[in-house]
């Protein structure tokens, strides 16, 4: 069961519905998938960046622009290994960005909020835009590299800007 205000969002299009059905994606009888709408995504991003701006130690917010879950990917991007079969079409919560359809609209909304509110004077905080999906092996390898550099005290803000999938 889901509160009526959320169901109304699926019906009126303010929430991404499964195959434009006006309904949420029901994974199984116990799990219904619902992701944040535009306003909720922006509020979440603002909350995240407000907290991260206060960091006193090495911190990198690495944003995967091609999607954030198995259900948040285009059919072109989908694979069994990433949790959504290409034959099923777009993931049930995939919301492509109108300016860059290979990127998630939620990711671009969050990125915009991060850029507007990021304390660029905090040398402990870097925000990195990656042309990856969160489930890409290359993305996981990059996260591991970044964490390793932090643990080894080699990390510096801006040090990854020349990597292949780093866009900003």
Enumerate the predicted regions with their spans.
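C-terminal non-catalytic interaction/assembly regions of soluble proteins
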Residues: 5-168
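Oxyanion-binding "anion nests"
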Residues: 1
